[in-house]
Amino acid sequence: TQASGKKTTYDYDKLNDLLEKSYQDAKGETSEKDVTYAYNSAGERVSMKDQTGKSSYEYDALGRITKVTSGSKKDVSYVYDDADNLQAIVYPDGTKISYEYDLNDNLVKLTDRNRKVTTYKHDALNRVTEVTRSNGTKTEVSYDAEDHITKIVNTCGSCGKVISTYEYKYNDQGYVVGETATELEAGTRKTPSWEDWYNWGDTQKETDKADCEHQEKEIQTTRTYEYDDNWELTRCTEKAEGGKKTVHNYTYDKIGNRTSYEKIEDGVSKAKYNYKYNDSNQLIKRTNAKIWGDPGTTYSYDKDGNLIQECDKTNSADPVTYEYTAENRLAVVKQGGTVLMAAMYDGDNNRVFELDNTYKWEDCYGDEVLIPANQRTEDGNSPKEQLASLVKGGSNAKGYTLTEYINDINRENTEVLAEYGADEKVRQAYTYGESGIGERVSVDKSEESSYYLYDGRNSVTGILTETANLTNSYQYDSYGNLTSGTADGVNYYGYNGESTNVKTGLQYLRARYYNAENGTFTTEDSDLGTTENPLTRNRYDYTTNNPLNYSDPTGHSLWSRIKSTAKKAAKAVKSVGKKIVNTAKKVVKTVVNTAKKAAKTIVNTVKGVAKTAKNAAKHAKQTYQSVKNRVTSSSTYQKITSRGSQFIRSVSNGVQKIGKTYTSFKSYVSERTAEIRSEVVRHMCTTTNRITDKLGKVDWNAVKKVAIGITAVTVSGLVVAATGGLAAGAVLAALPAMGGLGTAMVSGAVIGAIGGASYLSLIHISEPT
């Protein structure tokens, strides 16, 4: 029950699987359509019914998701290779992208929907060093000994010209303190057309975008960054070659609220804003210090902590209002009675439909909506019509665009695979490659494909055509405001590679929307933070005011803010366990799936990953690769356990060097030890109950026959999930081998016997040191 009186009720089955979510308003009346779930005998979700329709899910014998059907009956399929790598994704229209890997499971070749190829090269530590696209452009990446990106160079393969270069310097804590960016600016060149010659050779009327070879304007910008004792960004000083020196100053209070921002050009103050907050750290007023007596912009919130109104009194603008779902997801943004943006989410709170004010009459105008008659859910409702009903006719009616998002949920963070219009045609589709910098490779539109270029923060800085024409170039300030370039379309992918809505200026970060202008979210974080670091207790600030070194792709807690290069460490080691699972006997599928579910719970609870762990994680992948398909004896498992312990020790030693991050993580784990314990116990008990239901009486004496082991170890910022079909002796030997590391650790093992059908849950939890 929320402060406003809104209530969400959760109903579970006897195995603790969520069956239903229902919503009531403060009066106790149903406020939204219930969400219902169904599962198979292995505990895998097979369907979800919500306001967007009924979604269904299919799995293979190893519990990997192979097909997702959306509420609008659009299918996305997944294919895997023998090493458990994702081999292909099939889109709803039948097109597909395919992946090829080297012996270390590094992605080396990506073939997109149009059969265009992107290739990758890696160094000895399995880090991406080179990306070559089908249009001939190439990206080269360099690293230092601490795994920081030191240089990114984007070049045109056909002409050899450098499109952009980004160089970075770091302090002892691993934070960026210097940056040099050299970039071509997307522009135009004069080209004669038939109309030009008809008009007596006037070549001034029509232009097209210049390709890299003919692009002349190059901009070099140097930036330095300063931080306070809490590692909050306090100053950015930038100097464009031949241009002005610009200083951006930020100040904060003790809890991390921004109190002022000032922009100074060549020593002259050009802009200054002051910020005021209430006791809940909610921004309630922003004033322009350059305007005497400025009434400013005021902000109002509901009882649940959601921003509901923004009034720009300085410019006497119409108020902007915000409305939310029962689970506090942004639903509608209006200004002066006109809908700017509206969104609809599925039962997992993934954005599925969106209505945007574009002044284009392609989908709806006033009360008239162009939607195919067959686009209805099982109960006769049309999600698109529900969104379109928000548009009012009359003098304020504008043109609106309806978009359906087909999401890839088989990723760490849900990403959009394709966008459909109300006419059920694909507007654009996206291709994803190697995780980390530049993960979103290209966008495929009806006319042609375009390729994204990125800087070291994973922000989109350029867009190239198939012929290497630079059509767009972008620059951002530290908090994500677009300072150079023009945003195209309804939503564009820019700062940190995430989607920003053009009309509202809000960036969609899945659980919440981010306002780059103020450096705050529109809703409070559901994560409470840690007691050790007060800045994590601020539930509205962005990345604890350290946006250069952290991102927040989920809209949640500090540990999900660590950039993807660090997260790759956890993902790499996690895949080791998945490979061992694939060698296990399929007859124990039920236990494996339930064990994997427990591991996932721990991983989601403790997501912090120290950057210095990546190299060790990659090394561990190579170690495990050599025995991937030969895990058949106890001696082999003992070798794996030994090497795994060595890996964990190396990670433990490495992360202790990063000081504050390591200390904060220990506190985070310590506060959640009880939570982790209860979750592990719950899932292990669920395993026992599930097996008991299927196979009858448990024979505790048969535990030595065959075993399934799961070890989920969190080591100061590294989450390792390894699930495998181990012999009972190997499991028992593995626990003490991994338990004496003196670091935050959670390990669980489900040991079973197939012949006599018995299973035992073992839980070992040691407190963080």
Where on the chain are the PLM-derived regions?
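Residue-level detector of conserved catalytic or cofactor/ligand-binding positions
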Residues: L760-T769
